[in-house]
């Protein structure tokens, strides 16, 4: 796939493809986090890089996942216009409680997940990332699952749903 993203990021809708880990992904995250912090101002308490692109050595869909921590979940709704100016579409909660999701680009390069800073979603997402970073056995098991799902899942939603039990079991 040709991409205009300088970091080789981007995945078309409903495509399930894993890329080798790229050591430039943390820089891609940092640059985008700075753009978001500048645009949203003090409503953002913190932004963390999470998901597989935040785990050195782990193959991942070439989409940067960002966790944006706010004081109140309804603040996610107040971000819609500012995030649109940055190229993000609001995707609702996707059935996840206490969660707002924004995606950047038709060829998706970034996903921004807005949750309450320090809340259950915040702790769960970062707990899973930290477990993958620290535990090579869990990381290898997760990679095997991701590779199977990338090959077999008919949609991106099915790919994500196929990982949910593993993620929940390893988040805390």
How would you label these PLM feature ranges?
Residues 35-77:
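Active-site nucleotide-donor binding segment shared across nucleotidyl transfer reactions
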Residues 88-120:
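Conserved catalytic core of two-metal-ion nucleotidyltransferases
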Residues 8-13, 57-61, 106:
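Short, flexible turn/loop "capping" segments at secondary-structure junctions
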Residues 78-87:
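Short amphipathic alpha-helices in soluble, non-transmembrane regions
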Residues 1-48:
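Helical scaffold of the NTase/Pol beta-like nucleotidyltransferase catalytic core
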Residues 14-24, 68-69, 127-132:
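Short histidine-centered catalytic/ligand-binding loop motif
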Residues 120-172:
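Catalytic cores of NTP-dependent nucleotidyl/adenyl transfer enzymes across multiple folds
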């Amino acid at each position: 796939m040709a991409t205009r993203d300088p970091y080789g990021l981007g995945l078309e809708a409903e495509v399930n493809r894993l890329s080798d880990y790229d050591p430039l992904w943390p820089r891609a995250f940092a640059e985008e986090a700075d753009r978001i912090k500048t645009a949203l101002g003090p409503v953002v308490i913190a932004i963390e890089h999470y998901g597989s692109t935040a785990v050195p050595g782990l193959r991942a869909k070439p989409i940067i996942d960002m966790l944006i921590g706010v004081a109140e979940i309804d603040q996610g709704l107040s971000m819609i216009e500012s995030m649109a100016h940055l190229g993000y579409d609001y995707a609702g909660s996707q059935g996840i409680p206490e969660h707002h999701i924004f995606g950047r680009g038709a060829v998706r390069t970034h996903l921004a997940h807005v949750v309450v800073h320090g809340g259950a979603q915040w702790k769960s997402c970062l707990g899973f990332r930290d477990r993958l970073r620290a535990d090579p056995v869990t990381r290898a098991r997760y990679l095997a699952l991701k590779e199977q799902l990338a090959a077999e899942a008919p949609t991106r939603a099915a790919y994500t749903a196929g990982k949910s039990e593993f993620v929940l079991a390893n988040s805390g």
